[in-house]
């Protein structure tokens, strides 16, 4: 998911997306441990998506306090 797409979402939508991605990450890690995952790169991609969302939320928080 691109950062430009994420920036269009509201804070509430981003927080919901984080919860969704964290659940997905949990399931991917579980599948990886039992050996049933076919694309292990999806784990790293999900972690990066979570980081992107957290970065956008932090930027908005800083802009709100400074601006």
Curated annotation (Swiss-Prot):
Q: Which superkingdom heads the taxonomic lineage of this protein's source?
A: Bacteria
One MF term from GO for this chain? structural constituent of ribosome
Q: What is this protein called in UniProt?
A: Large ribosomal subunit protein uL29
The gene that this protein is the product of is: rpmC
Q: By its UniProt entry, which NCBIfam families does this protein fall under?
A: L29 (TIGR00012)
A GO CC annotation recorded here is: cytosolic large ribosomal subunit
State the similarity comment.
Answer: Belongs to the universal ribosomal protein uL29 family.
Q: Which PROSITE patterns match?
A: RIBOSOMAL_L29
> An example of a Gene Ontology BP annotation on this entry?
translation
Q: Could you tell me which PANTHER family the record lists for this protein?
A: 60S RIBOSOMAL PROTEIN L35/50S RIBOSOMAL PROTEIN L29, LARGE RIBOSOMAL SUBUNIT PROTEIN UL29C
Provide this UniProt record's keywords sorted from A to Z. Answer: Ribonucleoprotein, Ribosomal protein
Question: Known SUPFAM superfamilies for this protein?
Answer: Ribosomal protein L29 (L29p)
